Design a protein with these regions (language model features):
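Mature, structured domains enriched in cysteine- and short glycine motifs
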Residues: 1-98
Length: 98
């Protein structure tokens, strides 16, 4: 598990190396209502055409997971007591085993 804050270049490089990984898009300050799960290759969170800081700057962080096994711990760390994301991306439709 790796977290990116104010490092879009590092984050985008991680998504290229781990296209089958998972990304939790979260607010800068933990908010259990905003823990969005994406696949690492989701174009809504890995398009290099966005302005610098669009992904890991401003109000957001990215928590990157190379395997599904890490997901529950990461979600709990963000305040999700059941260890699940608050939402799954409607574009990449990440599937996880229950």
């Amino acid at each position: 598990m790796i977290e990116f804050i104010d490092d879009d270049l590092g984050y985008l490089a991680w998504t290229v190396v781990h296209p089958d990984g998972y990304v939790l898009n979260v607010r800068r300050s933990p908010d259990p209502r905003y823990v969005i799960l994406h696949r690492a290759n989701c174009k809504s969170i890995s398009n290099e055409a966005h302005a610098p800081g669009a992904y890991t700057g401003r109000s957001y962080r990215k928590i990157c997971l190379s395997s599904e096994a890490m997901l529950q711990a990461a979600a709990k760390r963000e305040g999700r007591s059941d260890g699940t994301p608050s939402k799954r991306c409607g574009h990449c439709l990440p599937l996880i085993r229950s």
